[in-house]
């Protein structure tokens, strides 16, 4: 590692598994002071051994909780928004509750964290905000991902909007649109869909693999 994040403070959501977990460890390995959060703090039990400085329970659906933790930890240089929820369904099978939950976790949570941490970045005259979107978004349509794709498209939109508003004040805002990543979340969704569709877990996993241009699932470390 190069130590390129030495002296930087990074705040991450959904650091208990998958991309968030791998990124927390990667940031720490590069020298950052990492503040990792997750709805389930027990999933972050191994992070401090990997150099992560702080771990906190956080429900990103709560504005009060986000604001309180932001005030507690103080200004950061890097905000990594990774919390997400994958709903499976079409417009005809997606309830209002499914739609609202998808947008609350996938898009509005980023609105909350950016609003909480951006003032500190502006005071310093620099900062980096990284939002995890998805290939299932404005990038491309994926069958059976109606609410998920729409909410992740919103992530692309809010990323561009914040970038346009604050680039001249030293704030960089980017989104990453991964393909399907091997993770505990994917394992759980594969088992759920196998049961619903009357297929094996292996058949469902192959459906995910077949959609990937490189012919395999990605890894969180990648």
Where are these regions (language model features)?
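Active-site loop-to-helix junction immediately N-terminal to the catalytic Tyr of the SDR YXXXK motif
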Residues: 94, 141-149, 161, 189
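Active-site helix of classical SDR
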Residues: 114, 151, 159
């Amino acid at each position: 590692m190069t130590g390129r994040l030495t002296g930087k403070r990074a705040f991450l959501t959904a650091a208990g598994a998958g991309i968030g977990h791998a990124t927390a460890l990667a940031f720490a390995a590069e020298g950052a002071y990492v503040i990792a959060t997750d709805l389930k703090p027990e999933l972050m039990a191994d992070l401090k051994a990997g150099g992560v400085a702080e771990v906190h329970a956080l429900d990103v659906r709560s504005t009060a909780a986000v604001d309180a933790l932001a005030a507690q930890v103080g200004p950061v240089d890097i905000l990594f928004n990774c919390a997400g929820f994958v709903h499976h369904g079409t417009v005809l099978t997606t309830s209002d509750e499914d739609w609202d939950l998808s947008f609350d976790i996938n898009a509005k949570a980023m609105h909350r964290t950016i609003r909480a941490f951006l003032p500190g970045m502006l005071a310093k005259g620099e900062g980096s905000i990284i939002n995890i979107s998805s290939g299932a978004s404005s990038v491309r349509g994926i069958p059976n991902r109606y609410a998920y794709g729409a909410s992740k498209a919103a992530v692309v939109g809010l990323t561009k909007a914040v970038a346009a508003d604050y680039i001249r004040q030293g704030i960089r805002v980017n989104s990453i649109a991964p393909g399907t990543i091997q993770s505990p979340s994917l394992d759980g969704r594969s088992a759920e869909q196998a049961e619903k569709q009357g297929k094996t877990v292996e058949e469902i996993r192959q459906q995910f693999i077949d959609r990937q241009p490189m012919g395999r699932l990605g890894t969180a470390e990648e």
